[in-house]
Amino acid sequence: MKRTYQPSKIRRQRKHGFRHRMSTKNGRRVLASRRRKGRKVLSA
């Protein structure tokens, strides 16, 4: 049985990257809350 997590940089960026977060209202809300919390890394 193969593992479920098969890393891909492109897929990671497209699903969880900064530009993808900025493209939706809720994504911007995620970034805002992470800024508020003081996260060093905002997105993948």
Curated annotation (Swiss-Prot):
Is the keyword S-adenosyl-L-methionine in the record? no
User: Does Ribonucleoprotein appear among the keywords?
Assistant: yes
Q: Which GO terms describe its cellular component?
A: ribonucleoprotein complex; ribosome
The cross-references to Pfam families, in alphabetical order and at most eight, read:
Ribosomal_L34
The annotated region (Disordered) lies at 1-44
The record, for Gene3D superfamilies, names: 1.10.287.3980
Under the GO molecular function aspect, what terms does this record hold?
structural constituent of ribosome
GO biological process assignments: translation
Which keywords accompany this UniProt record? Ribonucleoprotein, Ribosomal protein
Q: Which family does it belong to?
A: Belongs to the bacterial ribosomal protein bL34 family.
User: What NCBIfam families has UniProt attached to this entry?
Assistant: rpmH_bact
- State the name under which the record lists this protein: Large ribosomal subunit protein bL34
Origin organism of this chain? Streptococcus uberis (strain ATCC BAA-854 / 0140J)
Its ancestry begins with: Bacteria, Bacillati, Bacillota, Bacilli, Lactobacillales
